[in-house]
Curated annotation (Swiss-Prot):
General function of this protein: Produces ATP from ADP in the presence of a proton gradient across the membrane.
Species name: Methylococcus capsulatus (strain ATCC 33009 / NCIMB 11132 / Bath)
Subunit description: F-type ATPases have 2 components, CF(1) - the catalytic core - and CF(0) - the membrane proton channel. CF(1) has five subunits: alpha(3), beta(3), gamma(1), delta(1), epsilon(1). CF(0) has three main subunits: a, b and c.
Name of the protein this chain belongs to: ATP synthase epsilon chain 2
Cell inner membrane found in the keyword field: yes
Membrane topology classification: Peripheral membrane protein
Keyword terms of this UniProt record: ATP synthesis, Cell inner membrane, Cell membrane, CF(1), Hydrogen ion transport, Ion transport, Membrane, Transport
NCBIfam families per record: ATP_synt_epsi (TIGR01216), PRK00571.1-4 (NF001847)
Superkingdom of this protein's organism: Bacteria
Protein family (similarity comment): Belongs to the ATPase epsilon chain family.
């Protein structure tokens, strides 16, 4: 059952290279710095930093869309959500083998490196790879009928 336009959020997702999504949604879920946050129409306005993770949208047509986010910022107004990120990938753009290789490389760097700045970078790369892999796992579980938005 469709929802009226007056009950939907206008959502924009962009990264440094392109506009990823522009449309109307009934729900947005994003990985805020302090935990996952869900946004519905008429939400209290706020601005938050986003950590690596997944963005989930429920579109005007009732379709669920999934994106990987490397980190960024989200601004929420009562009827609008804007997400600005370093990198955003649609779920179908994620390369599982590349994410596994990045995970292994980051784990190796964490084991071998004692320089604090280098360890911080390796940890961030590990978080990014794990976020991509978790999103793929969620989608596989969803295909098997075991998971919902």
């Amino acid at each position: 059952m469709g929802q009226t336009a007056s009950r939907l959020l206008t959502v924009e997702i962009v990264d440094v290279c392109r506009e990823i999504f522009s449309g109307r949604c009934s729900r947005v879920v994003a990985p805020a710095a302090d935990g996952e946050v869900g946004v519905l129409p008429r939400h209290t306005p706020f601005l938050t930093r986003l950590r690596p993770g997944e963005i989930r949208l429920r579109t005007e047509a009732g379709e669920d869309q999934y994106f990987y986010l490397s980190g960024g910022y989200m601004e929420v107004q009562r009827w609008e959500v804007s997400i600005l990120a370093d990198q955003v990938l649609r779920s179908q753009e994620i390369d599982r083998e590349a994410a596994l290789a990045a995970k292994r490389n980051a784990e190796r760097m964490l084991r071998e490196n004692r320089i604090p700045g280098e360890r911080d970078r390796a940890y961030l790369e590990l978080l990014k790879a794990l976020a991509q892999l978790r999103l793929l796992e969620r989608l596989n579980a969803r295909k098997m009928g075991r998971n919902r938005l």
